[in-house]
């Protein structure tokens, strides 16, 4: 399965739990004006920094150090697929925005297959998707691997006008269904999925890796909602 589409599907499954009330992200010890989703810096050499992390450079261990040890690390896999190695935060204050977050680890298929063989247990999530718990030795090894992408779903619904106000005008819009549109910001390495029926999804990669997100969207057929 293509990276972008599989990432969206697996993340939406992981983030299906209802969200909290607006303003709940204003927690003690959290600067409400820093680490916000639209505070993205680029280095002019194909890299970017968001939430104090650099996709493609920062490791899973860096994520723990920066955002906390509450992260849950597992392999998320659909039937007949190797799966993705992911870290999941059920609740993460990003400035004044409360969100759920998934970081995708840049692990090879061979490494993930080996981790699956040593895994302690597996359980089903939604449908036939499986969540596979790593052996402690593999958890330690995973901390040394770089993260490929960061995905965030804010607590509140964001319409397109609000997104444009915060992030600016997108470089491109790709409509994938009657209800879902991707707002692409290639210079920032950002894809914002606007969903009229669900929560919005923000996906961050290094700008030099933006084709990982864009190309599968161009190849996918437009889905029409049932009437």
What does each model-identified segment do?
Residues 36, 49-55, 62:
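Residue-level signal for functionally critical sites in structured catalytic/ligand-binding pockets
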Residues 38-51, 138-148:
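Acidic/histidine-rich, surface-exposed loop or edge segments in extracytoplasmic proteins
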Residues 40-42, 52-55, 75, 152:
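Generic structural "secondary-structure junction" signal
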Residues 21, 25-33, 58-227:
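A cross-family detector of function-defining hotspots
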Residues 2-23:
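Hydrophobic membrane-insertion alpha-helices, especially the h-region
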Residues 19-20, 42, 53, 91:
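Extended compositionally biased segments used for macromolecular assembly or nucleic-acid engagement
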